[in-house]
């Protein structure tokens, strides 16, 4: 396993935390990446639909989380409006997101505002993260922070990370790791605060961290300490959330939505493309066998399914169960110079089966884009085309 930190001339974090240019500890991967990966692992485990990052800064964590398929609403809040506007475009969908839409809708919103202000648009969230945030709050804001985040917003889970001051003596000439930090807590101080807050607002909490100490200094604990708070009894009910009065104090500075299969136009584009590709693959694979059969069966329909289950040279690899399902489905056939692929055959392929629940659904979506047989039970295409002749299929 790769070492988590090295002795070298560098900074603590590679992101925000300042250390004099002397011999210092460099974490590998950098400490900020370890923190973000910790959150991503939690998201992978718990699959929250609505996630907010308070004090989102340059939106690095949001950019890491936006690829997670379970998230449908991703929100960032920060006091620095210029930074939000500058980094907002990095959260917008790229061309690849349109070519391969997500399964579920995703909306991303960046709000300018203070984390100690109440805004009802953040009610009912599954996860709220506060990564290296609380140490930037003055005493007044720190006192209000639990009332807003734990009491008012009351999400199912809250993750709070903060520097562990017991680790600081391992850095040269460090009192506070950042000039903007108002305080840095020992493990006992953080855990005392966290347990008090958890007890007051009906949460349970467990403690961990990232940034392991070097050999011989294990007693100082992690460089970054983390509290994972979970609401006792699960998430707030929709009824409880709806009882809250609307309070919109934050200013939305960036909003974007991602294409998804839940949106009719993108679902149709994906389904038509998948059907077309599968039909073309079956047609091309039939051409060599067609030449062998020519002259033997006249103009009668020819079953060209073959005796073996499909094993593509490129593309998806099927399990034995999937192969059996495909092989047992109605087989493609030819009538004259036309090639027919039954919709039931197409539905046997995993990717198409995942998109469509049944034959009727597939037919209704593709009917105005792909030619179908007279009874609508199969896709129809020309058996041979210009390109086949050019490449001598």
Swiss-Prot record:
Cofactor binding summary note: Binds 1 Mg(2+) ion per subunit.
Chain positions covered by the region annotation Disordered: 283-309
Molecular function terms from GO: metal ion binding; O-methyltransferase activity; RNA binding; RNA methyltransferase activity; small RNA 2'-O-methyltransferase activity
An example Gene Ontology CC term for this record: nucleus
Cofactor(s) required for function per UniProt: Mg(2+)
Keyword presence, Oxidoreductase: no
EC number: 2.1.1.386
Catalytic activity: small RNA 3'-end nucleotide + S-adenosyl-L-methionine = small RNA 3'-end 2'-O-methylnucleotide + S-adenosyl-L-homocysteine + H(+)
Residue positions binding S-adenosyl-L-methionine: 60, 78, 114
Alphabetized Pfam families for the sequence: Methyltransf_23
Binding site for Mg(2+): 132, 135-136, 181
This protein's UniProt keywords: Cytoplasm, Magnesium, Metal-binding, Methyltransferase, RNA-binding, RNA-mediated gene silencing, S-adenosyl-L-methionine, Transferase
Domain of life: Eukaryota
UniProt-listed InterPro entries: Hen1 (IPR026610), SAM-dependent_MTases_sf (IPR029063)
Ranges annotated as biased composition (Basic and acidic residues): 290-305
GO biological process: piRNA processing; RNA methylation; siRNA processing
Localization: Cytoplasm
PANTHER family xref list: HEN1, SMALL RNA 2'-O-METHYLTRANSFERASE
Role description: Methyltransferase that adds a 2'-O-methyl group at the 3'-end of piRNAs, a class of 24 to 30 nucleotide RNAs that are generated by a Dicer-independent mechanism and are primarily derived from transposons and other repeated sequence elements. This probably protects the 3'-end of piRNAs from uridylation activity and subsequent degradation. Stabilization of piRNAs is essential for gametogenesis.
Protein family (similarity comment): Belongs to the methyltransferase superfamily. HEN1 family.
Annotated protein name in UniProt: Small RNA 2'-O-methyltransferase
Organism: Macaca fascicularis
Gene: HENMT1
């Amino acid at each position: 396993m790769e070492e988590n930190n090295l002795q070298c001339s560098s900074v603590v974090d590679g992101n925000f935390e300042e250390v004099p240019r002397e011999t210092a500890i460099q974490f590998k991967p950098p400490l900020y990446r370890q923190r973000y990966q910790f959150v991503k692992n939690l998201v992978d485990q718990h699959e929250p639909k609505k996630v907010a990052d308070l004090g989102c800064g340059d939106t690095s964590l949001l950019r890491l989380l936006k690829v997670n398929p379970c998230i449908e609403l991703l929100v960032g809040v920060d006091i620095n409006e210029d930074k939000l506007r500058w980094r907002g475009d990095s959260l917008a969908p790229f061309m690849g997101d349109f070519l391969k839409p997500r399964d579920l809708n995703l909306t991303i919103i960046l709000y300018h505002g203070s984390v100690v202000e109440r805004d009802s648009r953040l009610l009912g969230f599954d996860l709220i993260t506060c990564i290296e945030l609380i140490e930037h709050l003055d005493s007044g804001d720190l006192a209000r922070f639990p009332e807003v985040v734990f009491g008012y917003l009351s999400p199912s889970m809250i993750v709070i990370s903060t520097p562990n001051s017991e680790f600081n003596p391992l850095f040269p000439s460090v009192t506070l790791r950042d000039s903007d930090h108002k305080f840095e807590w020992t493990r006992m101080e953080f855990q005392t605060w966290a347990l008090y807050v958890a007890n007051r607002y009906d949460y349970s909490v467990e403690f961990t961290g990232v940034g392991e100490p070097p050999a011989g200094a294990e007693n100082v604990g992690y460089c970054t300490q983390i509290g994972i708070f979970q609401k006792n009894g699960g998430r707030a009910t929709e009824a409880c959330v709806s009882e809250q009065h609307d309070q919109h104090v934050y200013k939305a500075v960036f909003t974007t939505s991602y294409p998804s299969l839940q949106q009719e136009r993108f679902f149709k584009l994906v389904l038509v493309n998948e059907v077309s590709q599968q039909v073309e693959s079956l047609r091309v694979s039939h051409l060599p066998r067609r030449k062998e059969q020519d002259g033997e069966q006249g103009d009668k329909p020819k079953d060209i399914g073959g005796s073996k289950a499909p094993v593509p040279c490129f593309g998806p690899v099927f399990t034995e169960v999937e192969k059996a399902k495909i092989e047992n489905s109605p087989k493609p056939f030819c009538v004259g110079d036309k090639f027919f692929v039954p919709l039931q055959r197409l539905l046997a392929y995993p990717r198409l089966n995942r998109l469509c629940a049944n034959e009727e659904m597939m037919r209704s979506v593709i009917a105005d884009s792909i030619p179908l047989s007279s009874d609508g039970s199969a896709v129809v295409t020309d058996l041979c085309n210009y390109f086949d002749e050019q490449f001598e299929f």
